[in-house]
């Protein structure tokens, strides 16, 4: 089975913002970099995550001002995490259970990366079609997702 560390975004590539920046500024960073979330920090300690869904539900949905509202007020906290050796199936199940699309990835309890639904879809869609559609396709899918 494929562990999430295979397709995670390493921590040094993950974007983090200070808890005091405005939601508008965070949204612009997300738009400009083509990502759906940023981690939120307080004195370089990760205290949460802001996703595009958080912005829709907790800012737009509540009629708040994006320039006057800090990311701390719309973030999800704590970041829900999964061990790097868990499988893509485990990550999918956790995201479904928690109704989220982003997970922190840990090694020995320390955050080492992030994964999103988009990362999982990209990973699976980039597998050679002959692996998925060919004679051994079922075996390959079992290796990726595990047995039901």
Name these PLM-found stretches:
Residues 45, 101, 110, 131-134, ...:
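Generic detector of intrinsically disordered, low-complexity, polar/charged segments
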Residues 30-33, 38-54, 95, 103-118:
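A glycine-centered beta-loop-beta connector
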Residues 21-26, 37-42, 56-62:
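Short, functional N-terminal and low-complexity linear motifs
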Residues 16-34, 81-99, 106-107, 124:
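The conserved cystathionine-beta-synthase
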